[in-house]
């Protein structure tokens, strides 16, 4: 199945049903009181995380989604039926952004999590709601409000503990093949990896972590060059990044300059991503003598003024990979639990959150009644008119 990690959709919540104007009609009661019921609420639109999905491709072909309208109110004080909510299933790791405002609505990071993205319209009020001591036969009612409409951008961000980054042909795919059961394509030409790959590294039955491999990054990626820039977002949720450096590039380029390119592009793309824990992993040590390899790696470390963790491996023959994965596992286990990200420190507000309060308050002011004139039992009073 084709991997699609970004789509644009339009969601429309259901409109609220209108209130009803109706009066009680019975034998021997010529002028019955009001009995018009309220309408039903319109359906909300939710996104729900489904672990059985791993791509957003379905929404590439079906972009418009609308919840049903609430029923209108009925006589005899019958409330209209509220509409069912519309639930759209998306992969775990999906982020929703409002395209019109740029507001990030939220992330779906675990199975079964639901997120409201469009609020259904409120129900209209029937004329029974407007009965008072001074208005025994109200003909007022209110219409249901329209459902909220949003244009959304859905982004799928892979959930992984470890992310691999580096230039094309640095050996990232070979590394993920050597430490996990993942089988990404490996070849001797650039951009063999065209989509992100995930692999599970199991040290024993109780200890494991997920590792992500994205397409290689090239110079100018932050400005749109190559494939890496559109997939860098998949590393945002990783807890640690492994910068894979090819010490013997096939094109004869300088590995130090190649490493500087990656660091520069990372900083330009996202400060948060650039600030994540990052280890340097020198790869392809099997291509040179041990003394020559040490000379090359020492020069790169000095050129980068690198003070962090350094590992030297050969992903092809799996030399040094076991020690690397063990240290990564220990590092992840010692990290403090991740705190749930709060978006802008406030809750997303929807269009009709205060509709009922404002509507009822407005009609209360119109009645202009004193407390002494009002009796809650008036709602149940049956009035008989005689000529």
From Swiss-Prot:
The UniProt annotation places GTP binding at 166-173, 191-195, 213-216, 283-286, 314-316
Q: What is its EC number?
A: 3.6.5.-
Location in the cell reads: Cytoplasm
Tell me which residues make up the OBG-type G domain: 160-333
The SS bond pairs are none
Q: Where is the Obg domain?
A: 1-159
Q: Using the UniProt annotation, give all residue ranges assigned to the region (Disordered).
A: 361-387
GO CC, sorted alphabetically, is:
cytoplasm
What are the names of the required cofactors?
Answer: Mg(2+)
**Family per record:** Belongs to the TRAFAC class OBG-HflX-like GTPase superfamily. OBG GTPase family.
HAMAP family, sorted: GTPase_Obg
This chain's function reads: An essential GTPase which binds GTP, GDP and possibly (p)ppGpp with moderate affinity, with high nucleotide exchange rates and a fairly low GTP hydrolysis rate. Plays a role in control of the cell cycle, stress response, ribosome biogenesis and in those bacteria that undergo differentiation, in morphogenesis control.
State the name under which the record lists this protein. GTPase Obg
Q: Which organism is this protein's natural source? A: Colwellia psychrerythraea (strain 34H / ATCC BAA-681)
Query: What lineage does UniProt assign to this protein's organism?
Result: Bacteria, Pseudomonadati, Pseudomonadota, Gammaproteobacteria, Alteromonadales
